[in-house]
A protein has these predicted regions:
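Soluble "head" domains of membrane/secretory-pathway proteins
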Residues: 2-7, 23, 27, 32-33, ...
Length: 234
């Protein structure tokens, strides 16, 4: 016991710093590494995004117990949630809020009877953000099979990545989002395990919102920093 007390006295400043950092990251803000391309082109593999854990709730440190509701997710928010279905922390975009009636056919969303509008900004996406074929992984998707479109999400414009030739997995019939749930999709519409696979997202699983990156490291290029993606608004 004396040894423990002595260790604490010797390192109390360091221990206090560690405790404060743990509390801060569990209740106020955190950094989330994005390992997949399900949110391309908005978020790419290797991005470290800032998670605002006070966006919707005040949470008890370490336990993720919600003490006070501050707000609810809005359509278009990029949310971070702990999915019990996939047993993983996921990052997706909210496209349906409670009360919405949503369907998707041929990668075109219809929300409350309004078919969303899409426009093409660039003829070809930036190849640095795309999966390209390689001898090590021949199943990766080639550049000319995907295109990026601007999606008007009922007033919020953002980019989505879709398969040029369509995909049956992008289709679902009308779904009414019940109270306490959200419908979330990846911006990379044909390569995302989202509400089409794991179902609607319970409000209680949502832990925060992201609006910008902190930094980005390129996993395909020896983790070289992508300076143009530092502090990038999403």
């Amino acid at each position: 016991m004396k040894a423990i007390i002595s260790l604490f006295k010797t390192n109390k400043d360091l221990l206090l710093f560690i405790i404060l950092m743990v509390v801060f990251r569990s209740s106020f803000a955190d950094i989330n590494r994005v390992p997949t391309g399900s949110m391309q082109p908005t978020i790419v593999e290797g991005d470290r995004i800032v998670v605002n854990k006070l966006a919707y709730d005040v949470q008890l440190p370490l336990l993720q117990t919600k003490l006070l509701k501050l707000d609810d997710p809005k359509r278009g928010d990029i949310i971070i949630f702990e999915s019990r279905v996939s047993n993983n922390r996921l990052v997706k975009r909210v496209v349906g809020i409670p009360g919405d009636i949503i369907s998707m056919h041929g990668n075109q969303l219809t929300i409350n009877g309004t078919s969303l509008k899409y426009s093409q900004e660039h003829s070809n996406p930036d190849s640095s953000d795309l999966d390209t074929p390689s001898s090590a992984n021949p199943d990766r998707i080639s550049l000319d099979q995907y295109t990026d479109l601007n999606e008007d999400l009922l007033g919020l414009n953002h980019q989505v990545r879709i398969h040029r030739f369509g995909s049956s997995s992008a289709n679902f019939n009308s779904v009414t989002v019940p109270k306490g749930y959200y419908l979330a999709l990846g911006d990379n519409r044909d390569r995302s395990a989202d509400s089409r696979m794991i179902g609607l997202i319970p409000r209680k699983e949502i832990i925060g919102r992201s609006q910008r990156t902190l930094m980005s490291l390129d996993p395909e290029n020896y983790y070289v920093p992508r300076l143009d993606r530092f502090f990038k608004v999403l």
